[in-house]
From Swiss-Prot:
HAMAP family: UPF0502 (MF_01584). Belongs to the UPF0502 family. It holds the Pfam family DUF480. This is UPF0502 protein YceH. PANTHER family: UPF0502 PROTEIN YCEH (PTHR38768:SF1).
Amino acid sequence: MKYELTATEARVIGCLLEKQVTTPEQYPLSVHGVVTACNQKTNREPVMNLTEQAVQEQLDNLVKRHFLRTVSGFGNRVTKYEQRFCNSEFGDLKLSAAEVALVTTLLLRGAQTPGELRSRASRMYEFSDMAEVESTLERLASREDGPYVIRLAREPGKRESRYMHLFCGDVDELSLQTSVPDSASGDLQSRVEALESEVAELKQRLDSLLAHLGE
């Protein structure tokens, strides 16, 4: 697969995919916007603390690889970035809205169960039921130009198998073992995280609006 990303590159692309859908009025993103999105404490696993210089290096590299492109509007001296990772005019990777939501959530959070993915991806796409989540994951796992996700072996004591994206290469399942219980408490945690993400984005929108009114 030609999509061989580092963990930081996956975070940058995941953030741009997320913000393109959830906060379209702030998209494309400036370097500062990408830094803020990458270092979010909600809906991110692991939480990162990237510097602007480190993010700029990742952006420059991704532009060279044609996964991103720069956008400069008339009269706007700030360079902004938009993703060309999928669904771009000349790109090869075409994903449905449901597939984009799942891929984005996997890029931002790593291996997750279908239940966790349904809850955490809900701001990008509203799945009708668990069957739709699972069928979308299976399509991503069986695509001729893929596979793009893999179903991991179910861990002892867990009800659901987790899925992981393959955009960073082969998966070492042992390194993905977690102590998070796949139970009602895990579902509750997912719902709390989704609410925290919504609050964080509303605060970001309010700050942006107040800054605009103060200009």
